[in-house]
Amino acid sequence: MPLEQRSQHCKPEEGLEARGEALGLVGAQAPATEEQEAASSSSTLVEVTLGEVPAAESPDPPQSPQGASSLPTTMNYPLWSQSYEDSSNQEEEGPSTFPDLESEFQAALSRKVAKLVHFLLLKYRAREPVTKAEMLGSVVGNWQYFFPVIFSKASDSLQLVFGIELMEVDPIGHVYIFATCLGLSYDGLLGDNQIMPKTGFLIIILAIIAKEGDCAPEEKIWEELSVLEVFEGREDSIFGDPKKLLTQYFVQENYLEYRQVPGSDPACYEFLWGPRALIETSYVKVLHHMVKISGGPRISYPLLHEWALREGEE
């Protein structure tokens, strides 16, 4: 059976938005007004939902403004900005349709990002490299002008949620291979029919423990995960059974240790880094990684400097 057919039921339905916001991916921006938030909400990476891959091809994207020499670096494209200016001068004539046009455009763009993420996850599961030509032909299609934005957001999604990085190994042929973040040897796949790597979830847990010190109480882990809308006893659309991941899979892979707090009555439990995590990465690398993907110092790690000094002495 083709890989794409085997993996159809593995697509998550929702959850990326909350995870991206909680990790600070869009938190580095200045506060926006309600109108600005409404206009730009669908442009953020974390609104991409893999379960919303369209069955039919998205409509053609708008053509670039005449004379434009480079792709805009934000989602507030000059084409739409000019449309807003024009519409603001016509308020007395009736409501403008340009905001609706932008909303539709941003939604279509987000679907393209979601479709590319799903395509890349299939490639990762098959352990195959991917080329720019494949991405353009299989996913992007006539949205080639916006490929840099689509590719950037899809790459950020892979790194933030799934713990996967894309590395260009052939700049001429634009060939990319997949690598797990922080050089971890764990691919995050739990079975033959899984395309949703759990490496990103593991990195989040390692970061929570590092933030706490040498160990983290189990209740603290769940408190932090609740911000990502991941809860004990509730199946997650991306990560599956989080309790089983934490106390069984990651422990069996030697990335975590799960033990009873000595002398606790009633019994309390805590998590520590396992021997495999200690060999493959370090506290400071994990914390630096989380700060990087958060887009800035929104997540506070007071022990970051302490651990950096400690590792420098070793």
UniProtKB/Swiss-Prot annotation:
Ubiquitinated by the DCX(DCAF12) complex specifically recognizes the diglutamate (Glu-Glu) at the C-terminus, leading to its degradation. Expressed in many tumors of several types, such as melanoma, head and neck squamous cell carcinoma, lung carcinoma and breast carcinoma, but not in normal tissues except for testes. The keyword Ubl conjugation applies. Residues 109-308 form the MAGE domain. Pfam families: MAGE, MAGE_N. Residues 21-44 have a biased composition (Low complexity). GO terms for cellular component: nucleus. SMART domains: MAGE (SM01373), MAGE_N (SM01392). GO terms for biological process: negative regulation of autophagy; negative regulation of transcription by RNA polymerase II. The keyword NADP does not apply. Residues 1-99 are annotated as: Disordered. It comes from the Eukaryota. Residues 1-20 have a biased composition (Basic and acidic residues). Residues 65-87 have a biased composition (Polar residues). Activator of ubiquitin ligase activity of RING-type zinc finger-containing E3 ubiquitin-protein ligases that acts as a repressor of autophagy. May enhance ubiquitin ligase activity of TRIM28 and stimulate p53/TP53 ubiquitination by TRIM28. Proposed to act through recruitment and/or stabilization of the Ubl-conjugating enzyme (E2) at the E3:substrate complex. May play a role in tumor transformation or aspects of tumor progression. In vitro promotes cell viability in melanoma cell lines. Interacts with TRIM28. This is Melanoma-associated antigen 6. It comes from Homo sapiens (Human).
